[in-house]
Amino acid sequence: MIGSNEMKYNYHTHTSRCNHADGSDEEYVLSAIEAGFDEIGFSDHTPWPYRGFVSAMRMREQELASYVKSVKELRDKYKDKISIKLGLECEYFKEYIPWLREVIDKFELDYVILGHHFTPNEQYGVYNGFPSCAQDLVNYKNEIIEAVDTGLFSYIAHPDLFMRGYSSFDKTAKKVSKEIILKSIEADIPIEYNLMGVLHSQTMGREGYPYGEFWKLAGELGATAVIGIDAHSPDSYTDYERYRKAEEALKTYGVKLTDKIKFLR
């Protein structure tokens, strides 16, 4: 079974609608039940109301209603076996925040997580996993802070995403990391230790994210973390060893681990 500390939760789950995940929605639920989870959340990549641009990494706007319907039906079907929450993973694209607020109310979302993949936008912006210069890190940090100030987000997903492609944990990386961590503490929301990043690092053959120096700093500053499986296939839920290693790493870094996030309703 998953989780040596009995924290049997995960709020970072994708679906095949995002075009880079496998399996049916129900297969994720069944896998989570098999692994002994008490509560999971679906948080697929949000659509945005783009005009003239089609993203390859997220559902279309017209798919949102069916996504919501599916998750709510599964929540009812398996309510005696597992608690299921409805959410989205969203960037902070300032021009679309009013639209996001409408979506939250219309579809009665339980939560939204901040996965800030692009700055300042997807179509013409920088992918924050591969920043090209120090200023890209500063821009990422500034938008993370502005996003947290909206009060919409339950936690910051893969806050150290930039270390996937940034050359070193230099002075800028450390300063940016410190400001993101302190903002999460000020807002009383966790930062996420992302297990998909662990797989990326293994594929690259070097440390990317989660990045040790970032999490060492998080421990020193007194941050709180959630573990995010960032599930892109149902069998992600039964990768017990990766989950346990994450718990051990956070303990080593002195980072407090929580199973509580703030819900919108």
Describe the residue ranges of each PLM region.
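An N-terminally biased module of ancient metal coordination in phosphate/nucleic-acid-related enzymes
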Residues: 1-94, 104, 166, 170-175, ...
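Short, well-ordered coil/turn segments that N-cap beta-strands
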Residues: 5-7, 36-39, 80-86, 107-110, ...
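Conserved, mostly hydrophobic/aromatic
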Residues: 12, 32, 112, 158, ...
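Domain-core and long-helix interface of multi-subunit machines
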Residues: 19, 113-221, 237
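Non-catalytic positions within long, well-ordered alpha-helices that form the structural scaffold/packing
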Residues: 33, 105, 148-149, 219, ...
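Active-site gating loops and adjacent loop-to-helix segments of metal-dependent hydrolytic enzymes
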Residues: 45-62, 111-129
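Conserved active-site loop/cleft motifs that coordinate metal ions or position small ligands
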Residues: 192-194, 224-230, 259-261
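Mid-to-C-terminal alpha-helical segments outside catalytic/metal-binding sites
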Residues: 240-265
